[in-house]
């Protein structure tokens, strides 16, 4: 039995940090474990320009705890009006590392998202030309499509035409949740990668309904059936370089989760690597954690691997039931429960 595991310092390739006082309360949780993180742009208003990304980056750096070494990797929010010129400016900035596709209405703060990807053809061509990755929330928003099928339908109706029209465009299929997506990414031609969250590795959709509605397990894309969870575990632990860590840690105030119409998102930044270690240990694949968490992501993005290390030890500890979040409180996934790994 392994009791201590030291890996190259990991990165988080999909993270929500919010802004203002809330940002200040959560950014330290990520910086404590990760060297870098891809920062999602779905603020209100969204981060749609390089200038806005620069300003947000400066706010993140200012909010870091003293002595912290952490690099926020910024992204732009793709809209119907994003121009090729903005893409080229973003690429030249050195701090914008992706452009995020949110189908309009697909998730939190996505109302400004793309209504028809065909309107973005010139922008996507510019991204392909300059090597700017497209980060995709892979769900359709057609109300006639069952919520559990939205990812599979997205592959057929959006992803496949996108890859056909822009075969050299680097695409990250974010927070995949289905066997279909895992197989698509594994077998795709050209530069395609995928992030996988800890909660989608650990839980299936039953977790939403144990003893009643469990709002802190509600996220988008929603948890799927066990067949899909097992396929995600197989992908994450396979050692395949197209799969890498992205927490999709998404903090919402307790009152907005425990609500008649609660927000989607699980807060896992506080204990992300502990959760991933648990998932990989359950699959007898702790030896594959370093590749997934620390190596595959920077290799895909064309960035250097981190120089430092992170150590996890087998240690029972109780996760706080809730933590400060601006003027309110935030409930982490599994808040108040015991964990069996701890970062040191």
UniProtKB/Swiss-Prot annotation:
Alphabetical keyword list: Hydrolase, Metal-binding, Pyrimidine biosynthesis, Zinc
Record has Cytoplasm as a keyword: no
GO MF assignments: dihydroorotase activity; zinc ion binding
Source taxon at top rank: Bacteria
EC number: 3.5.2.3
Residues noted as binding Zn(2+) 1 in the record, renumbered to the chain: 14, 16, 100, 248
Modified residues (N6-carboxylysine): 100
Residue stretches spanning the membrane: none
Keyword Metal-binding in record: yes
Any one GO CC term of the record: cytosol
Pathway where it operates: Pyrimidine metabolism; UMP biosynthesis via de novo pathway; (S)-dihydroorotate from bicarbonate: step 3/3
Co-factor note (free text): Binds 2 Zn(2+) ions per subunit.
Protein residues bound to substrate: 16-18, 42, 137, 220, 252, 264
Record-listed Zn(2+) 2 binding positions: 100, 137, 175
Catalytic reaction(s) noted: (S)-dihydroorotate + H2O = N-carbamoyl-L-aspartate + H(+)
PROSITE patterns reported in the protein's UniProt record: DIHYDROOROTASE_1, DIHYDROOROTASE_2
Cofactors demanded by this protein: Zn(2+)
Active site residues of this protein: 248
Family to which the UniProt record says this protein belongs: Belongs to the metallo-dependent hydrolases superfamily. DHOase family. Class II DHOase subfamily.
Alphabetical list of NCBIfam families matching this protein: pyrC_dimer
Function: Catalyzes the reversible cyclization of carbamoyl aspartate to dihydroorotate.
Subunit and partners: Homodimer.
Entry protein name: Dihydroorotase
Provenance organism: Ralstonia nicotianae (strain ATCC BAA-1114 / GMI1000) (Ralstonia solanacearum)
